[in-house]
Amino acid sequence: MSEPVNKVKQTQQQVDDVTNTMHIAVGKMLDNQQKVSELTDKSENMKQGAQQFKKKTNEIKRLMWCRNIKLTLIIIAVVVLLLVVIIVPIVLKFT
């Protein structure tokens, strides 16, 4: 009679062990799922940040190009003005 009781206790112990193992595995799975969700959120945020960064850099690039063109035009105007100031009196003197 003690042998069936021992088998029942042994089987119950095995069931308890499997149950504990399953609880641990499910807990780890839920933790991993949470981590994957967090990583997905972070990667989406990084993607949005990269898109905003690219947009901003293109805006700045365009702005700097415009400033460069303006500066070039100002330099050309100053050079032309200087040439006019220098050449016109010389031409008038010889005419």
Swiss-Prot record:
GO molecular function, one term: SNAP receptor activity
Gene Ontology cellular-component terms listed: plasma membrane; SNARE complex; transport vesicle membrane
Transmembrane stretches, start-end: 71-91
Subcellular location: Cytoplasmic vesicle, Secretory vesicle membrane
Induction annotation: Regulated by the srfA transcription factor.
Key words, A-Z: Coiled coil, Cytoplasmic vesicle, Membrane, Transmembrane, Transmembrane helix
Vesicular side: 92-95
Membrane protein topology class: Single-pass type IV membrane protein
Record domain v-SNARE coiled-coil homology: where: 7-67
Example GO biological process: vesicle fusion
Primary location class: membrane
Ranges in the topological domain labelled Cytoplasmic: 1-70
Record has Coiled coil as a keyword: yes
Keyword presence, Membrane: yes
Entry similarity comment: Belongs to the synaptobrevin family.
Function: Involved in the targeting and/or fusion of transport vesicles to their target membrane.
Name of protein: Synaptobrevin-A
Originating organism: Dictyostelium discoideum (Social amoeba)
